[in-house]
Design a protein with these regions (language model features):
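Long, Lys/Arg- and hydrophobic-enriched amphipathic alpha-helices
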Residues: 194-349
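A residue-level signal for conserved active-site and pocket-lining positions in enzyme catalytic cores
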Residues: 27, 151, 279
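A short SAM/SAH-binding and catalytic strip from SAM-dependent methyltransferases
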Residues: 147-169, 205-209, 217-228
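Generic recognition of stable, solvent-exposed alpha-helical segments in well-folded globular domains
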Residues: 3, 19-22, 55, 59, ...
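Conserved protein kinase catalytic core
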Residues: 91, 124, 160-161, 237
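A mobile, often basic/glycine-rich helix-loop segment
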Residues: 150-200, 242-251
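Active-site flanking residues adjacent to catalytic metal/cofactor-binding acidic residues
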Residues: 84, 117, 151-154, 230
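Rossmann-like AdoMet
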Residues: 1-145, 298-301, 322-349
């Protein structure tokens, strides 16, 4: 058992079972022992636990830079434009976007104030060292305010802790984490989540994460804004399809899917498909206008129309093909844009 596993075990032995969302939060975000708090251990790379669009190469950042530039131009090229990136991992996307913006338009680059939101102190220190003042690393956006800007969130929503439920005897039960003979084990209790009730016996699924508390601070911070969420996920109809009997929760360790979420707490990634319907509902309640989601292949192709005409190198074309390939990132990932305030959305289509 891991050090974090021992801490969680001691907690449930003393205080009783905890929700899976609570367990997942500890596994990923414990300030010293959580998966994302591990210093010096690569999680995103060919040698880590998973790859992302960012680790494919700099083209992903270039394409997003083109999208931001179009939005900036459509809204009068303001002298100050704030970009907020939550959960920036090692800062590579930030640097790729800033370099691409510099090449696109020095005027746009001088207007950009780039903020990286990272609540984990160990991550903030490493980000500050890597970014070297090119972006400001903040612990919370609560005290910040910007007239106009954008949020870029790549593979963030899938790492928000989710509760787990299963159907038994026509009722929903919440799956809990408890102790059994010195090890972590499953428990359950009756529950009444806001989930469909016409699903089969034994059906297991995730409930939505706590989206409101995550999305409200950046919505308050950016008065007029374009928010771009890129992630793997489904709408509610597909997510809670009767045939999807085992849910979407997955564990990753060194590019392999692991079978058991209770194994190696803090040492493996835990993730679940994003419920885009739930995201849209919260966004609407926060005053956003929702724009139709599209798969990453279509989205990046629209973003990169001008870039594709600029004679990119064979290496860049190879990266682009990986990013839009239907069996890789292109078909599995979706981009959801939303705008708030008095802005021109600078429609891609």
């Amino acid at each position: 058992i891991t050090d974090l596993g021992r801490l969680i075990l001691a907690r449930v032995e003393e205080f009783g079972p905890i929700s899976f969302a609570d367990y997942m939060a500890q596994c990923l975000y414990h300030p010293e022992l959580g998966y994302y708090a591990r210093p010096g251990k690569p999680t995103v790379s060919k040698n880590g636990d998973f790859i992302t669009s960012v680790s494919v190469g700099s083209v992903f950042g270039k394409l997003l830079a083109h999208r931001l530039y179009k939005f900036w131009c459509a809204n009068g090229s303001p002298k100050t434009f704030t970009i907020l990136e939550p959960g920036a991992h090692d800062g590579s996307l930030c640097l790729d976007i800033l370099e691409a913006i510099s090449n696109l338009s020095p005027e746009f680059r001088s207007a950009v104030d780039y903020l990286v939101h990272e609540p984990l102190s160990v991550r903030r220190k490493s980000l500050q060292a890597k970014l070297q003042g090119k972006a400001c690393v903040i612990a919370t956006p609560d005290d910040c305010h910007a007239k106009i800007g954008a949020l870029i969130a790549n593979e963030i929503l899938d790492a928000l802790p989710v509760p787990l439920y299963f159907r038994s005897n026509g009722q929903w039960h919440e799956i809990l984490v408890t102790s059994n003979a010195g090890s972590l084990d499953w428990d359950s209790r009756p529950a009444k989540p806001d989930l469909p009730t016409n699903l089969p016996e034994g059906y297991v699924t995730e409930g939505p994460p706590e989206l409101s508390s995550f999305m409200t601070p950046p919505a308050r911070m950016l008065e007029n804004a374009l928010f771009i969420w890129i992630d793997y996920g489904l709408d509610e109809e597909a997510l809670y399809h009767p045939a999807r009997t085992a849910g979407t929760l997955r564990c990753y360790f060194k590019h392999k899917t692991c079978a058991h979420p209770l194994e190696n707490p803090g040492e493996q990634d835990l993730t679940a498909d994003v419920n885009f319907t739930a995201v849209e509902k919260i966004a609407s309640s926060l005053g956003f206008q929702i724009h139709p989601a599209m798969n990453q292949s279509r989205y990046l192709t629209y973003c990169g129309k001008e870039w594709l005409l600029s004679n990119p190198s064979p290496k860049e074309i190879s990266q682009f093909q990986t990013l839009i390939h239907p069996t890789q990132f292109g078909g599995r990932f979706y981009a959801l844009e939303m705008t708030k305030g008095n802005v021109d959305p600078a429609s891609l289509i």
